[in-house]
Amino acid sequence: VLARSCIAALFNERAKKKKFERKYPNMKKLLSLLLALALVFSLAACSSKTDDTTTDDTQGDANAESVDLVVFAAASMTETLTQIAEMYKEVAPNVNITYNFDSSGKLFTQISEGADCDLFISAAPKQMNAMDGSLIDDKDKNPDGLDLIVTDSRIDLLENKVTLAVPEGNPKSIESFDQLAELLKNGDVMLAIGNSDVPVGQYTEKIFAYYGLDEAALADSLTYGNNVKEVTTQVSEASADCGIIYATDAYSAGLTVVDSATTEMCGQVIYPAAVLKGEKEEAAQAFLDYLQTADAMSVFESVGFTAL
Protein backbone atom coordinates (compact mmCIF):
# COMPACT_ATOMS: atom_id res chain seq x y z
CA VAL A 1 0.00 0.00 0.00
CA LEU A 2 2.82 2.41 0.93
CA ALA A 3 4.63 1.69 -2.32
CA ARG A 4 1.50 2.32 -4.36
CA SER A 5 1.00 5.64 -2.52
CA CYS A 6 4.57 6.79 -3.28
CA ILE A 7 4.29 5.84 -6.93
CA ALA A 8 0.99 7.65 -7.20
CA ALA A 9 2.47 10.76 -5.61
CA LEU A 10 5.41 10.69 -7.99
CA PHE A 11 3.17 10.46 -11.06
CA ASN A 12 1.03 13.22 -9.62
CA GLU A 13 4.05 15.58 -9.29
CA ARG A 14 5.17 14.78 -12.82
CA ALA A 15 1.71 15.49 -14.09
CA LYS A 16 1.68 18.87 -12.34
CA LYS A 17 5.12 19.70 -13.78
CA LYS A 18 4.01 18.83 -17.33
CA LYS A 19 0.83 20.84 -16.86
CA PHE A 20 2.90 23.84 -15.66
CA GLU A 21 5.31 23.52 -18.58
CA ARG A 22 2.37 23.35 -21.05
CA LYS A 23 0.87 26.46 -19.46
CA TYR A 24 4.20 28.35 -19.32
CA PRO A 25 6.29 26.82 -22.12
CA ASN A 26 9.11 29.50 -21.93
CA MET A 27 9.46 29.64 -18.16
CA LYS A 28 12.48 27.30 -18.06
CA LYS A 29 14.36 29.44 -20.57
CA LEU A 30 13.35 32.58 -18.68
CA LEU A 31 14.67 31.24 -15.40
CA SER A 32 17.96 30.26 -17.05
CA LEU A 33 18.22 33.73 -18.57
CA LEU A 34 17.53 35.44 -15.25
CA LEU A 35 20.14 33.29 -13.55
CA ALA A 36 22.71 34.15 -16.21
CA LEU A 37 21.95 37.88 -15.95
CA ALA A 38 22.29 37.76 -12.19
CA LEU A 39 25.69 36.16 -12.56
CA VAL A 40 26.82 38.79 -15.09
CA PHE A 41 25.73 41.72 -12.88
CA SER A 42 27.44 40.15 -9.90
CA LEU A 43 30.74 39.83 -11.76
CA ALA A 44 30.42 43.37 -13.13
CA ALA A 45 29.89 44.77 -9.66
CA CYS A 46 33.04 43.06 -8.38
CA SER A 47 35.02 44.28 -11.37
CA SER A 48 33.73 47.83 -10.90
CA LYS A 49 34.73 47.82 -7.27
CA THR A 50 38.24 46.67 -8.18
CA ASP A 51 38.52 49.25 -10.96
CA ASP A 52 37.33 52.00 -8.64
CA THR A 53 39.97 51.05 -6.11
CA THR A 54 42.68 51.01 -8.77
CA THR A 55 41.46 54.29 -10.24
CA ASP A 56 41.37 55.91 -6.83
CA ASP A 57 44.97 54.83 -6.21
CA THR A 58 46.09 56.11 -9.60
CA GLN A 59 44.28 59.40 -9.20
CA GLY A 60 45.74 59.69 -5.74
CA ASP A 61 49.22 59.73 -7.26
CA ALA A 62 48.25 61.99 -10.16
CA ASN A 63 46.29 64.37 -7.99
CA ALA A 64 48.92 64.73 -5.26
CA GLU A 65 49.13 68.31 -4.11
CA SER A 66 51.13 70.39 -6.58
CA VAL A 67 54.33 71.95 -5.26
CA ASP A 68 56.11 74.90 -6.88
CA LEU A 69 59.78 74.67 -5.96
CA VAL A 70 62.14 77.60 -6.54
CA VAL A 71 65.81 76.70 -6.94
CA PHE A 72 68.60 79.30 -7.09
CA ALA A 73 71.74 77.84 -8.65
CA ALA A 74 75.09 78.95 -10.03
CA ALA A 75 74.99 79.77 -13.74
CA SER A 76 77.49 76.99 -14.44
CA MET A 77 74.78 74.45 -13.56
CA THR A 78 72.27 75.64 -16.16
CA GLU A 79 72.53 72.72 -18.58
CA THR A 80 72.81 69.94 -16.03
CA LEU A 81 70.05 71.06 -13.68
CA THR A 82 67.70 71.72 -16.59
CA GLN A 83 68.17 68.13 -17.73
CA ILE A 84 67.79 66.77 -14.21
CA ALA A 85 64.51 68.67 -13.74
CA GLU A 86 63.06 66.71 -16.67
CA MET A 87 64.23 63.46 -15.07
CA TYR A 88 62.72 64.46 -11.72
CA LYS A 89 59.27 64.73 -13.30
CA GLU A 90 59.25 60.93 -13.53
CA VAL A 91 59.93 60.69 -9.80
CA ALA A 92 57.77 63.55 -8.53
CA PRO A 93 55.27 64.61 -11.23
CA ASN A 94 53.52 66.95 -8.82
CA VAL A 95 56.64 69.10 -8.30
CA ASN A 96 57.14 72.08 -10.60
CA ILE A 97 60.71 73.39 -10.50
CA THR A 98 61.54 76.99 -11.35
CA TYR A 99 65.22 77.85 -11.66
CA ASN A 100 67.03 81.13 -11.20
CA PHE A 101 70.51 80.80 -12.71
CA ASP A 102 73.05 83.57 -12.15
CA SER A 103 76.31 84.30 -10.40
CA SER A 104 76.33 83.03 -6.83
CA GLY A 105 77.01 86.56 -5.59
CA LYS A 106 73.89 87.95 -7.23
CA LEU A 107 71.81 85.03 -6.04
CA PHE A 108 73.02 85.56 -2.48
CA THR A 109 72.07 89.23 -2.66
CA GLN A 110 68.58 88.38 -3.92
CA ILE A 111 68.04 85.80 -1.18
CA SER A 112 69.32 88.09 1.57
CA GLU A 113 66.91 90.76 0.35
CA GLY A 114 63.95 88.40 0.68
CA ALA A 115 63.61 86.71 -2.71
CA ASP A 116 61.53 83.52 -2.73
CA CYS A 117 63.97 80.59 -2.77
CA ASP A 118 63.62 77.02 -1.48
CA LEU A 119 67.00 75.53 -2.42
CA PHE A 120 70.34 77.26 -3.02
CA ILE A 121 73.35 75.79 -4.83
CA SER A 122 76.40 78.05 -4.89
CA ALA A 123 79.60 77.80 -6.92
CA ALA A 124 81.64 78.58 -3.80
CA PRO A 125 81.31 78.20 -0.02
CA LYS A 126 81.58 81.98 0.53
CA GLN A 127 77.98 82.78 -0.38
CA MET A 128 76.60 79.80 1.53
CA ASN A 129 78.65 80.65 4.62
CA ALA A 130 77.19 84.16 4.62
CA MET A 131 73.68 82.79 5.25
CA ASP A 132 74.57 79.84 7.50
CA GLY A 133 73.30 80.37 11.04
CA SER A 134 75.81 77.88 12.43
CA LEU A 135 78.50 80.44 11.50
CA ILE A 136 76.67 83.40 12.99
CA ASP A 137 79.49 84.07 15.45
CA ASP A 138 82.12 84.07 12.70
CA LYS A 139 82.03 87.63 11.37
CA ASP A 140 84.50 86.82 8.60
CA LYS A 141 82.28 84.12 7.10
CA ASN A 142 78.84 85.42 8.10
CA PRO A 143 79.32 89.20 8.47
CA ASP A 144 75.61 90.06 8.51
CA GLY A 145 74.65 87.34 11.00
CA LEU A 146 72.14 85.72 8.64
CA ASP A 147 70.36 82.49 9.56
CA LEU A 148 68.55 81.51 6.37
CA ILE A 149 69.36 77.87 5.69
CA VAL A 150 68.36 74.61 7.33
CA THR A 151 71.82 73.92 8.72
CA ASP A 152 71.48 70.13 8.82
CA SER A 153 70.63 70.13 5.11
CA ARG A 154 73.89 71.73 3.98
CA ILE A 155 76.18 69.50 1.93
CA ASP A 156 79.13 69.82 -0.42
CA LEU A 157 77.47 68.55 -3.58
CA LEU A 158 80.03 68.85 -6.38
CA GLU A 159 83.54 69.90 -7.32
CA ASN A 160 84.47 71.76 -10.51
CA LYS A 161 87.76 72.86 -12.09
CA VAL A 162 88.92 76.33 -13.12
CA THR A 163 90.32 76.18 -16.64
CA LEU A 164 91.93 78.30 -19.32
CA ALA A 165 89.82 78.03 -22.48
CA VAL A 166 90.41 79.38 -25.97
CA PRO A 167 88.15 80.08 -28.97
CA GLU A 168 88.11 77.96 -32.10
CA GLY A 169 91.49 77.97 -33.80
CA ASN A 170 93.28 79.34 -30.72
CA PRO A 171 94.51 82.45 -32.62
CA LYS A 172 97.05 83.43 -29.95
CA SER A 173 98.40 79.86 -29.64
CA ILE A 174 97.92 79.96 -25.88
CA GLU A 175 99.01 76.75 -24.16
CA SER A 176 99.10 77.30 -20.39
CA PHE A 177 98.53 79.58 -17.42
CA ASP A 178 102.30 80.09 -17.24
CA GLN A 179 102.34 81.43 -20.79
CA LEU A 180 99.22 83.52 -20.14
CA ALA A 181 100.94 85.24 -17.21
CA GLU A 182 103.81 86.33 -19.48
CA LEU A 183 101.44 87.51 -22.22
CA LEU A 184 99.51 89.58 -19.69
CA LYS A 185 102.68 91.21 -18.39
CA ASN A 186 103.57 92.20 -21.94
CA GLY A 187 100.05 93.32 -22.85
CA ASP A 188 99.92 90.83 -25.73
CA VAL A 189 96.58 89.16 -24.98
CA MET A 190 92.91 89.90 -24.22
CA LEU A 191 91.63 87.79 -21.33
CA ALA A 192 87.97 87.35 -20.36
CA ILE A 193 87.31 86.92 -16.63
CA GLY A 194 84.46 87.14 -14.14
CA ASN A 195 83.71 90.18 -12.00
CA SER A 196 85.16 90.20 -8.51
CA ASP A 197 81.74 89.57 -6.92
CA VAL A 198 81.23 86.21 -8.65
CA PRO A 199 83.02 82.97 -7.71
CA VAL A 200 84.78 82.44 -11.04
CA GLY A 201 86.15 85.98 -10.75
CA GLN A 202 87.28 85.33 -7.18
CA TYR A 203 89.10 82.17 -8.26
CA THR A 204 90.76 84.25 -11.00
CA GLU A 205 91.96 86.77 -8.42
CA LYS A 206 93.69 83.92 -6.59
CA ILE A 207 95.37 82.84 -9.83
CA PHE A 208 96.59 86.40 -10.40
CA ALA A 209 97.97 86.47 -6.87
CA TYR A 210 99.72 83.15 -7.48
CA TYR A 211 101.54 84.66 -10.47
CA GLY A 212 102.13 88.01 -8.79
CA LEU A 213 99.91 89.86 -11.27
CA ASP A 214 98.33 93.23 -10.46
CA GLU A 215 94.79 93.19 -11.85
CA ALA A 216 94.53 96.98 -11.91
CA ALA A 217 97.69 97.22 -13.99
CA LEU A 218 96.23 94.73 -16.48
CA ALA A 219 93.07 96.73 -17.15
CA ASP A 220 93.75 97.13 -20.88
CA SER A 221 94.13 93.36 -21.28
CA LEU A 222 91.00 92.31 -19.40
CA THR A 223 87.32 92.07 -20.27
CA TYR A 224 84.71 91.15 -17.68
CA GLY A 225 81.52 89.11 -17.41
CA ASN A 226 78.77 89.31 -14.79
CA ASN A 227 78.75 85.51 -14.51
CA VAL A 228 80.62 82.58 -15.96
CA LYS A 229 78.18 82.24 -18.87
CA GLU A 230 79.01 85.76 -20.04
CA VAL A 231 82.72 85.02 -19.85
CA THR A 232 82.18 81.79 -21.78
CA THR A 233 80.25 83.64 -24.49
CA GLN A 234 83.08 86.14 -24.95
CA VAL A 235 85.49 83.29 -25.57
CA SER A 236 83.08 81.43 -27.86
CA GLU A 237 82.59 84.57 -29.96
CA ALA A 238 86.37 85.20 -30.00
CA SER A 239 85.90 88.68 -28.60
CA ALA A 240 88.67 87.61 -26.20
CA ASP A 241 91.77 85.55 -26.93
CA CYS A 242 91.07 83.28 -23.97
CA GLY A 243 89.02 83.10 -20.79
CA ILE A 244 89.18 81.70 -17.29
CA ILE A 245 86.04 79.61 -16.84
CA TYR A 246 84.88 76.35 -15.29
CA ALA A 247 85.61 73.04 -16.97
CA THR A 248 81.88 72.33 -17.18
CA ASP A 249 81.15 75.56 -19.06
CA ALA A 250 83.99 74.93 -21.48
CA TYR A 251 82.57 71.47 -22.14
CA SER A 252 79.01 72.70 -22.64
CA ALA A 253 80.18 75.43 -25.04
CA GLY A 254 82.48 73.12 -26.97
CA LEU A 255 85.57 75.17 -26.17
CA THR A 256 89.13 73.89 -26.07
CA VAL A 257 90.72 73.77 -22.62
CA VAL A 258 94.48 74.31 -22.74
CA ASP A 259 95.19 74.21 -19.00
CA SER A 260 93.56 73.66 -15.61
CA ALA A 261 94.34 75.54 -12.42
CA THR A 262 95.77 73.50 -9.56
CA THR A 263 94.54 73.69 -5.98
CA GLU A 264 97.75 75.60 -5.16
CA MET A 265 96.70 78.27 -7.64
CA CYS A 266 93.10 78.84 -6.58
CA GLY A 267 92.03 76.20 -4.06
CA GLN A 268 89.22 73.68 -4.52
CA VAL A 269 86.11 74.69 -6.43
CA ILE A 270 83.36 73.35 -4.17
CA TYR A 271 79.62 73.68 -4.83
CA PRO A 272 77.68 73.63 -1.54
CA ALA A 273 73.90 73.17 -1.48
CA ALA A 274 71.32 73.76 1.25
CA VAL A 275 67.59 73.97 1.86
CA LEU A 276 66.34 77.40 2.87
CA LYS A 277 64.02 77.84 5.81
CA GLY A 278 60.38 78.12 4.77
CA GLU A 279 57.18 76.29 3.95
CA LYS A 280 58.68 73.92 1.37
CA GLU A 281 61.59 72.47 3.29
CA GLU A 282 60.40 68.88 2.81
CA ALA A 283 60.00 69.19 -0.97
CA ALA A 284 63.31 71.02 -1.28
CA GLN A 285 65.09 68.33 0.74
CA ALA A 286 63.56 65.62 -1.45
CA PHE A 287 64.94 67.29 -4.57
CA LEU A 288 68.34 67.80 -2.94
CA ASP A 289 68.35 64.09 -2.06
CA TYR A 290 67.59 63.28 -5.70
CA LEU A 291 70.54 65.40 -6.84
CA GLN A 292 72.78 62.98 -4.94
CA THR A 293 71.45 59.86 -6.67
CA ALA A 294 73.43 57.93 -9.27
CA ASP A 295 71.10 59.09 -12.04
CA ALA A 296 71.60 62.77 -11.26
CA MET A 297 75.32 62.41 -10.63
CA SER A 298 75.79 60.76 -14.02
CA VAL A 299 74.47 63.97 -15.60
CA PHE A 300 76.80 66.16 -13.54
CA GLU A 301 79.81 63.97 -14.25
CA SER A 302 79.09 63.89 -17.99
CA VAL A 303 80.09 67.57 -18.28
CA GLY A 304 83.06 67.49 -15.92
CA PHE A 305 81.72 67.84 -12.38
CA THR A 306 83.08 65.54 -9.69
CA ALA A 307 80.69 64.07 -7.13
CA LEU A 308 81.54 64.69 -3.48
Question: What residues fall within each predicted segment?
Answer:
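Positively charged n-region of N-terminal signal peptides that target proteins for export
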Residues: 22-35
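C-terminal motif of bacterial Sec signal peptides marking the signal peptidase cleavage site
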Residues: 42-45
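Exported/periplasmic ABC-transporter solute-binding proteins
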Residues: 48-51, 56-86, 90-91, 105, ...
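Short beta-strand-centered segments that line the small-molecule binding cleft or hinge
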Residues: 108, 114-144, 150-156
